[in-house]
């Protein structure tokens, strides 16, 4: 009886939950660790989103002289936003630690799959296509990984590849005057011969060599350059001494012989790899756009919609300016805030088919209307603080690039005017499922392609409020589009007797 009483009393106590990390994240199991960091699975309790959090001790970082290394990794991850690269969502710090909040990739390392044996040819091809796509995207932005291997390649729950661990990466700014890198980086079995020689090397070519080794491993189940000791393996790498198994097709062998060339001047480029017949099987070039800081929307470039949409000139290289960056994800999905699609929706769908009604939101309340007035923005009183936001009195970036105006013009006229302004700037226009209009650039700048959203709200049966805001792309590019194209086109539609300011330090929140 006494034992039962003790047991009952113990079970009656509620288990004390551990405190939330930074007030937002419920930390789970340890996913992995290295010399300077541990990575945990975590969940944002407010949104339910699963993330991976990389935790680094500041003291270790400072003592090891890795401060510049960490800053470079942050800069690199912010520069390479791509559907096949693990995304950095935010960086936070306390007095003792630095935290990287990153995309959580559920499927784990590609290495674990290879360890069970060689992959089916179709799977190996798809992973290689996605790897080369991501690597080419990085190179076009002056970023070089320098440690490509199956352990640094993850697979998500949709079966798509994600390149991770840019800790050893380099940027073009770090090259010497000879245009080459001189730092030994990488894992010996995957390192190019010119890197082993410890002379200057072209980091792009070295990355592609590593991609070739990865392809061989995926298809064969073992390394192309093997020996009983490291010195013997180095000799084989320097000579390019490898043999392909009998199940490799002639086209695959031709591809590998072109990539695993010891002379970097003769080695296949990323574009050359993409032209190989074995590589092109099932390969779909696609463009993508980053929205809301972490959502990818992908569009195939080879479908009719993309051909009909305004595009860059035909002689523009397909791999950089147009955002044509590789193999499309396997199927439409939304997982971990990542949205992808197999094929592009029509960029000019539903031009006037909605009759205006579904574009209008008839539930504007008093707070909405007040917030439309400059100087009376109450959103800060109601928006949840994410803990990493701006300080009191600062203007959120989205509000800096948002404009609103009241109009008595028919919805169809407003939409036609928006489309004309977008077309004049070489942008495509499409209507989203929520009724908003998206104007999307076809060329990628440093911050990705420009994307501008326009929403039309019903104020009264005779009046509407039009809100225009930047969704993606650079602030300077948006400001140029707004002042040169959008404001002049919409001026006649504004139901307001106040003059429009021609010049101001930042964009006005009303036209």
Curated annotation (Swiss-Prot):
Region: PPI, residue numbers: 400-429
Protein kinase domain segment(s): 25-279
Catalytic activity reported: L-seryl-[protein] + ATP = O-phospho-L-seryl-[protein] + ADP + H(+); L-threonyl-[protein] + ATP = O-phospho-L-threonyl-[protein] + ADP + H(+)
Required cofactor(s): Mn(2+)
Keyword Transferase: yes
Any single biological process term in GO: signal transduction
Gene3D superfamilies in the record: Kinase associated domain 1, KA1 (3.30.310.80), Transferase(Phosphotransferase) domain 1 (1.10.510.10)
Keyword annotations of the record: ATP-binding, Kinase, Manganese, Nucleotide-binding, Serine/threonine-protein kinase, Transferase
Binding site for ATP: 31-39, 54
GO MF: ATP binding; protein serine kinase activity; protein serine/threonine kinase activity
Residue ranges the record marks as coiled coil: none
Keyword Kinase: yes
Enzyme class: transferase
PANTHER family registered for this protein in UniProt: CALCIUM/CALMODULIN-DEPENDENT PROTEIN KINASE KINASE-RELATED, CBL-INTERACTING PROTEIN KINASE 13-RELATED
Family: Belongs to the protein kinase superfamily. CAMK Ser/Thr protein kinase family. SNF1 subfamily.
Annotated domain remarks: The activation loop within the kinase domain is the target of phosphorylation/activation by upstream protein kinases. The PPI motif mediates the interaction with the ABI (abscisic acid-insensitive) phosphatases.
Protein name: Putative CBL-interacting protein kinase 13
Organism: Oryza sativa subsp. japonica
